[in-house]
């Protein structure tokens, strides 16, 4: 686990899937899901506005309406003055000054954020980014079939090509063809991820929780172990084991039918 000094407190942070409890990772993932889809600061407000405008201009009113609904929720979170991204970091805080921080309710996470609230934003962001990068790296290394995102690679390839085109415009001077290409790639990047619903019964938060509970039941039934007491490493190892066994059973079933 990682040690850090934040707002005068000695903080212990989970930074490895070997130790990170799955219940914390689930909550952490859900907070990042909300942060990515709704956000809670003025930059997120501006991003929603731009995306809604672009969707509507393209005639995609359904996604435009979803963006406006997410914009409304973003405004609510801004007024609450609580960053969802900060709450995701709070999920990874194991101890503050030697005392365990086991309350993963929203109130408990807010209390952690309050205790660390005097930390300069740059330091807070640095700690979260470092821990997130390490966890993401371990997940893609150990479970590439589950976490290696080909779509993300395509997105970053487009971003790289756009950056090169912008630099060429600066060095060689603007051309109409290059301007059109830059605008096309900008629109592709801005609209790359379709907006999700974060309100009502179809909320992705509700679906996220239901899928997790369903998978915990499956793992517990198949392995006779409590999935909610597993680390992230143990949980996804169990998931892959169950998936392999299901494929083998399916193959055996197919062979019996053809025999």
Regions found by a protein language model. Name each.
Residues 1-259:
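An amphipathic, hydrophobic-aromatic interaction surface with interspersed Lys/Arg
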């Amino acid at each position: 686990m990682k040690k850090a000094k934040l707002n005068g407190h000695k903080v212990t942070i989970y930074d490895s899937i070997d130790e990170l409890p799955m219940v914390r990772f689930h909550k952490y993932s859900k907070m990042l899901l909300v942060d990515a889809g709704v956000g809670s600061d003025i930059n997120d407000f501006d991003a929603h506005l731009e995306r809604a405008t672009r969707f509507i201009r393209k005639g995609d009113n359904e996604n435009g309406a979803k963006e406006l609904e997410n914009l409304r929720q973003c405004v609510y979170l801004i007024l609450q003055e609580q960053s969802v991204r900060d709450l995701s970091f709070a999920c990874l805080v194991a101890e503050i000054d030697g005392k365990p921080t086991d309350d993963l309710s929203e109130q408990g996470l807010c209390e952690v954020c309050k205790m660390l609230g005097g930390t300069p934003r740059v330091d807070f962001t640095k700690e979260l980014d470092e821990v997130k990068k390490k966890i993401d790296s371990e997940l893609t290394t150990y479970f590439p079939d589950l976490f290696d995102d080909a779509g993300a690679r395509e997105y970053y390839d487009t971003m790289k090509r756009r950056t090169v085109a912008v630099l060429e415009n600066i060095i060689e001077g603007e051309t109409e063809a290059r301007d059109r290409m830059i605008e096309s790639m900008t629109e592709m990047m801005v609209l790359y991820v379709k907006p999700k619903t974060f309100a009502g019964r179809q909320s992705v938060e509700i679906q996220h929780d239901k899928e997790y509970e369903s998978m915990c039941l499956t793992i517990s039934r198949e392995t006779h172990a409590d999935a909610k007491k597993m680390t992230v490493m143990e949980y996804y190892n169990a998931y892959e084991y169950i998936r392999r066994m299901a494929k083998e059973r399916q193959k055996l079933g197919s062979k019996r039918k053809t025999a």
